[in-house]
Design a protein with these regions (language model features):
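Conserved short "hinge" loops at termini or chain/domain junctions
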Residues: 1-99, 126, 133-150
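Elongated alpha-helical scaffolds
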Residues: 105-113, 117
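Mixed-charge, glycine-accented linear interaction segment located at domain edges/termini
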Residues: 117-126
Length: 150
């Protein structure tokens, strides 16, 4: 990597709350199946090992999220207190970034994208799946918009 390329990257450290993301994921699930009876909802999903699935997909989706915003993960540290420290290298004007807002949007993205991946093996309806896809896209657009601000 040449020096000009290195100068375009900035380091950003963000602390994400895994429990908050898990709660957001469950809220997304409630939204997707809102108004359905228990028989109509994809209950196979509820019978899955959600905490286990969440842990695996969460770490995968962190990498996906970072590549989508034009950066890469330098370091991830999952602490016992439920926080994940992510040190990112991203290409963006970093001066005016609202860290609280971008953290919330990242949590939104991770919650919706992890849930979307959980839905793939179960019998969710096309509408439910499209709702999750649109919510992940909306969160990612918001992240990119925040990072693009000078």
């Amino acid at each position: 990597m040449n020096m000009n390329t290195m100068e375009n990257y900035r380091t950003m450290t963000i602390m994400l709350d895994r429990e908050q993301i898990y709660r957001a994921m469950m809220a997304e699930y409630a939204l997707v199946v809102a108004g359905k009876s228990e028989e109509e909802a994809p209950m196979q999903y509820a019978k899955c090992d959600l905490p286990g699935i969440f842990k695996v997909l969460y770490n995968e989706e962190l990498g996906v999220m970072c590549s989508k915003i034009g950066g890469y993960i330098e370091h991830i540290d999952d602490s016992a207190d439920g926080l994940t420290e992510i040190r990112l290298r991203i290409t963006a004007g970093m001066a005016a970034i609202n860290y609280a807002l971008i953290r919330r949007r990242m949590e939104d993205y991770l919650a919706a994208s992890v849930l979307m991946r959980c839905f793939v093996p179960v019998r969710s309806t096309r509408r439910e799946y499209e709702l999750l896809v649109s919510r992940t896209r909306l969160a990612m657009r918001s992240i990119r918009h925040i990072l693009a601000r000078e």
